[in-house]
Amino acid sequence: MVNFGSIWGDIASPGVLAYCASKGAVHQITKAMALDHVGDGIRINAVAPGEVNTPMLSSGRPNPPTVAELAHLAHSTIPMRRLAEPEEIANVVAFLVSDAASYITGAIVPVDAGYTAR
């Protein structure tokens, strides 16, 4: 099982209190469920994406960013200097559900171009 957390589940950002709190809860639920079900042979992990090039980046905000503002965000705050593409997150999910990840459970895997490594 792979849950969807966010880097904002581990770090705070102004104006998105409920989002940060809910993603933090996803991270803790993932860890608790992993321990509860490890004896059942069920692996439970989560991905924690950073900024992903989807409509969500500009929806649900009082003042949605423009394309130019998103480009500036990527170049000024993300170490790899670009937004993630949805396929890049999907690739990590595919790995986590594969046999190659058979010894991984309870992990929160950041997919954030190095954002949380700073």
Regions found by a protein language model. Give the residues of each.
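Residue(s) in the substrate-gating loop at a strand-loop-helix junction
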Residues: 6
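Active-site helix of classical SDR
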Residues: 22, 30
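Short, flexible catalytic-loop segment of classical short-chain dehydrogenase/reductase
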Residues: 27, 49-59
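C-terminal substrate-recognition "lid" of short-chain dehydrogenase/reductases
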Residues: 82-111, 116
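Catalytic Tyr-x(3-8)-Lys segment
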Residues: 66-88
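Active-site "substrate specificity/gating" loop of NAD(P)-dependent dehydrogenases
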Residues: 10-16, 38-39
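Conserved SDR Rossmann-fold cofactor-binding beta-strand/turn motif
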Residues: 43-49, 53, 97, 110-112
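Alpha-helical segment proximal to the catalytic Tyr-Lys
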Residues: 35-39, 102
